[in-house]
């Protein structure tokens, strides 16, 4: 590609709507990195005569980052949704062979090609909303071959779509049926066989665990973290979603990239996260879908200065959500986040939750030229509208990879 000067734009370079430039320009090198950003009147002489792209006064933000998803899995669970609406309990659905076990079964039965096809359909609407980086977890295979297949598909999505994919091994997501009553033995399998094999194949960027009464205990979670540490892999945790239990504090002790959900997080956990630099990833889609009533402790997170990120938590059981903009709206409406917090939560703070703050979430010299162009008069509209297509163009590595008027 050729070096380009993008001009006639309003710039929110670092995901903060309180830090913008009204008449800005972005100089992008031929290798897809940013050479310079700033006021149009201050363009350095070396870039003035570069070929130009006129954005007609549109807002530009960093490409959005969806930092918590379960995008790869077999099938879907709309039938269970209908059953729950008819009054059937989750426990009864599980007794009938539904719930997470049904997704595990569908994922194990699906070919790699089928998993890719289904995940690609879920990914496309996110890309059309300006997402340029995404995390994808395993965790619906719960045995080596299927977990490998999920992570391979996640890697393939990053190779075949214009998006940076970060993979997370979530073998400790649930207890597979064949290990019923033998949770410690399954954790042995995760730590001693699955994680080493998948890490050796280069399929794992981070390791996650579901620490909860219906998931894995603190002791079991710590074993997974120790196994990750032996491999030099960063960790993250599903913590305090359904009950308090010290999961976030444990995650902080291992300097986790993030602790996610956090509805039942207490002040000790918040303080530990602040001390360790662990990002709080809030998932309002799941909160909404399961009709949760206990909100994450937003005021405590603010008071302690813990960075807040937002993510779709796309998954078939509790958050079949493929819109990061709707996630922003939910974060503001349900959790009372400000527009500033919501936009930072899907840019700079979301990138930090992936350990990728030096690559994504901000537009600065030397970084990838990944940005979204918006049809909006103000940045508040990104969190205000839902169901309205606002993203006009997506640029990845300096190249336009999506344009609404070109579809």
Swiss-Prot record:
Superkingdom as given in the UniProt entry: Bacteria
Cofactor note: Binds 1 zinc or iron ion per subunit.
TM spans (from-to): none
Pathway membership, UniProt: Amino-acid degradation; L-histidine degradation into L-glutamate; N-formimidoyl-L-glutamate from L-histidine: step 3/3
Pfam families: Amidohydro_1
InterPro entries according to UniProt: Amidohydro-rel (IPR006680), HutI (IPR005920), Metal-dep_hydrolase_composite (IPR011059), Metal_Hydrolase (IPR032466)
UniProt GO BP: L-histidine catabolic process to glutamate and formamide; L-histidine catabolic process to glutamate and formate
Binding site for N-formimidoyl-L-glutamate: 140, 315, 317
Protein family per UniProt: Belongs to the metallo-dependent hydrolases superfamily. HutI family.
PANTHER family tied to this protein: IMIDAZOLONEPROPIONASE, IMIDAZOLONEPROPIONASE-RELATED
Name of the molecule in the record: Imidazolonepropionase
Organism expressing this protein natively: Burkholderia thailandensis (strain ATCC 700388 / DSM 13276 / CCUG 48851 / CIP 106301 / E264)
Lineage: Bacteria, Pseudomonadati, Pseudomonadota, Betaproteobacteria, Burkholderiales
Gene name linked to the record: hutI
